[in-house]
Amino acid sequence: MFDFDATLPVMALQFILLAVILNGIFYTPLNKALDERADYIRQKETDEKERLAKAKELAQEYEKQLADARKQSQEVIAAAQADAQKIAAEALAKAQKEAQAKKEEAAVEIAQQRQAALGVLEQQVDVLSRQILEKLLGPELVK
């Protein structure tokens, strides 16, 4: 069926020689190119992971700074509101004090004017009463 002559070893030798030549000419440069490409991809992936980590870190720092700025602005606003309320309360107290003083002044003045008016009215009543009595009783009886 099969003849085992020199053809089989020659073909095996040719196959091995072809494999060695292809390995040297084709497979080694191809493997080298594939390895270089894989290294390049791994390097880029590592670089991108580092950039992503740095970007996340910067974003966290930015968020922290933003939160601090918001907190400070809220504190400033609260302090300004407290100052404004204090100033408004002082102004209101001053205005109320001035109004109370003017009210008391007006009350004293009204009381004085009332006393003066009552005094004048009393004198006029006395004069009118005397005149009425004189007319009714006559000037000789009224003294």
From Swiss-Prot:
Keywords: ATP synthesis, CF(0), Hydrogen ion transport, Ion transport, Membrane, Thylakoid, Transmembrane, Transmembrane helix, Transport. It is a single-pass membrane protein. The chain crosses the membrane at residues 6-26. One of its GO terms (molecular function) is proton-transporting ATP synthase activity, rotational mechanism. GO terms for cellular component: plasma membrane-derived thylakoid membrane; proton-transporting ATP synthase complex. The keyword Membrane applies. It is found in: Cellular thylakoid membrane. CDD domains: ATP-synt_Fo_b (cd06503). InterPro entries: ATP_synth_b (IPR034679), ATP_synth_B-like_membr_sf (IPR028987), ATP_synth_b/b'su_bac/chlpt (IPR002146), ATP_synthase_B_chain (IPR050059). It holds the Pfam family ATP-synt_B. F(1)F(0) ATP synthase produces ATP from ADP in the presence of a proton or sodium gradient. F-type ATPases consist of two structural domains, F(1) containing the extramembraneous catalytic core and F(0) containing the membrane proton channel, linked together by a central stalk and a peripheral stalk. During catalysis, ATP synthesis in the catalytic domain of F(1) is coupled via a rotary mechanism of the central stalk subunits to proton translocation. Belongs to the ATPase B chain family. F-type ATPases have 2 components, F(1) - the catalytic core - and F(0) - the membrane proton channel. F(1) has five subunits: alpha(3), beta(3), gamma(1), delta(1), epsilon(1). F(0) has four main subunits: a(1), b(1), b'(1) and c(10-14). The alpha and beta chains form an alternating ring which encloses part of the gamma chain. F(1) is attached to F(0) by a central stalk formed by the gamma and epsilon chains, while a peripheral stalk is formed by the delta, b and b' chains. This is ATP synthase subunit b'. It comes from Rippkaea orientalis (strain PCC 8801 / RF-1). The lineage of its organism: Bacteria, Bacillati, Cyanobacteriota, Cyanophyceae, Oscillatoriophycideae.
